Amino acid sequence: MAIFEVCGLVKSYGRRRVVDGVDFRVERGEIVGLLGPNGAGKTTCFRMACGLIPPEEGRVILNDMDVTDWPMYRRARDGGMGYLAQESSVFRALTVQQNLLAMMEMLGIDRKTRKARCDELLHDFNIEKVRKSKAQSLSGGERRRLEIARLLVTDPEIILLDEPFTGIDPVTIDNIQQIIRNLSDQGISILITDHQVRETLPITDRSYVVRDGKMLCHGTPDQVIQHPEARQHYFGEAIELNSGGPPQPHVWNRAAESASRHTG
């Protein structure tokens, strides 16, 4: 059953229709990608899904509620939605621990529960060693882990991730991918949009590819990578997916890409 669904989204800027009747859905516990080339309209779709901008037409359904006209804060408070922006959202002058505790205090969680939950999140996200460090001193990976940990304070049922793999090193990317899988295993739904398709597509259960403001295709990673128009206009002909070993169900065949680059 879909926990999150958008139906017939439309958005124009001036005379240009940048999103034209887009539909997509996210099932409970599912990881879904929203992908597409630059200028395709995927970012506008994502921002309408989050509640950052209103659609001209269409509906956004969250937990069986029509939240089309709800601002983001209400979708989080009453609908169980979490959102991680591409830009840093940590309180830079506070320590890692204070970032988590401040969020819990805002929610009215009692002191004893706050401490226990804070310790749990610090451990789960491997940021115990920097618990007393100011957020402004964190590495990109530490900051990203803190942001996701802070999201979980609100116990979201679905998390929307905007460019989660931007500005972090390959080791941290692997770590964030595993965190996303773990969240899915816990029953939390995930919607991701990211320009880093090699990092995003392999961890999704399904993905949607947007082109020219319309939905070009959707399906499993293997299905979308084989779609002729998606390959032509977005993925490229040299990219393949292999069913791979654990913990990643799909890995990119970089050999084909490398061979093409050296012979082309």
Predicted regions and their residues:
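The feature captures the beta-strand-to-loop junction immediately N-terminal to the Walker
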Residues: 35-37
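Helix-to-loop junction immediately C-terminal to a conserved catalytic motif
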Residues: 50
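Conserved ABC ATPase "signature" region
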Residues: 65, 101, 112-130, 177-181
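Catalytic Walker B motif of ABC-type/P-loop ATPase nucleotide-binding domains
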Residues: 159-163
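Conserved ABC ATPase signature
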Residues: 134-138, 142
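ABC ATPase NBD coupling module
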Residues: 54, 66-82, 87, 111-115, ...
